[in-house]
Amino acid sequence: FACNSSPRFTNVPVSFVCLGQSFTFNHGVTDPDGDSLVYSLVNPMRNSTDSIPFVSGYSATNPITSVPALSINTANGDISMTPTQVEVGVLSVLIKEYRNGVLVGSVVRDMEVYVRMCNNNLPSESGINGTNIRDRTICPGTLICFDIMSNDVDSSQLVTMTWNQGITGATFSVSGTPHPTGNFCWTSPTAVVGTQVFSFIVTVRDDACPNSGFQTYSYNISVRSPINALSLTPISCNGAADGSATVVVSNPPGTYTYAWTPGGQTTQTISAQGPGSDTVFVTDTATG
């Protein structure tokens, strides 16, 4: 695809994972072109054409013995597992790039995972403002700020919090000890066509010896351009019901669905049914 930049990895592939502990990792992928990224697990490749087969009981989507089963979030790339067996596994992550719903490129990254016994509890971090939510949708030109909290069951350990500077122009300040809080702030760009996703990752790491424990999570902000216009045809006279309203969406071009309330109409245009107010929800079928 002409004029396409490949996704970039900002996090080192994980090496060691603790037996019996819930663990989340993210490669910290950024895309210079702002393309939409979709993640999946695939077979590792021996060369450009041949994949490496797994032994019985294992597969590309089940490379590590884990309860619940190892999983990858297809939207943000978070890999989650709770290993139940000391072993070594290989994960291959395929990242596909989409631009306006069209596949423009892909890249694969392998990582080797060693599951071992640990005498240390991994640190953890919250979602946005202490919740479990790590995704937000905002309009262009909007200021968004939120906190991310860290924690560690081993209360005597010192936890550090870092981010990968994944969003240009954003700030991330860390304060507090031994379990710091990170504050993220950013004003979204005003020139956004359709929906563009901006992502960053945050890593929390303790000071356990001889090997520190860590986890990495992704945070994703979708910037979605608003509806361009609403075309109205006024009623011809007082008491008439011959007016209409039409939703006009031209940025970006695409296929949309419509849901009006009250009334339940699903057309782009509705005719006046009498006095009152109407609300319309517009959904881009390509991005949801």
Residue ranges and their predicted role:
Residues 88-99, 196-207:
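A short beta-strand micro-motif common to beta-rich folds, especially ectodomain repeats
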Residues 96-104, 205-212, 283-288:
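Short, solvent-exposed loop/turn segments at the edges of extracellular beta-sandwich modules
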Residues 45-69, 74-80, 166-185, 258-273:
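Surface-exposed, flexible coil segments in extracellular/virion-facing regions
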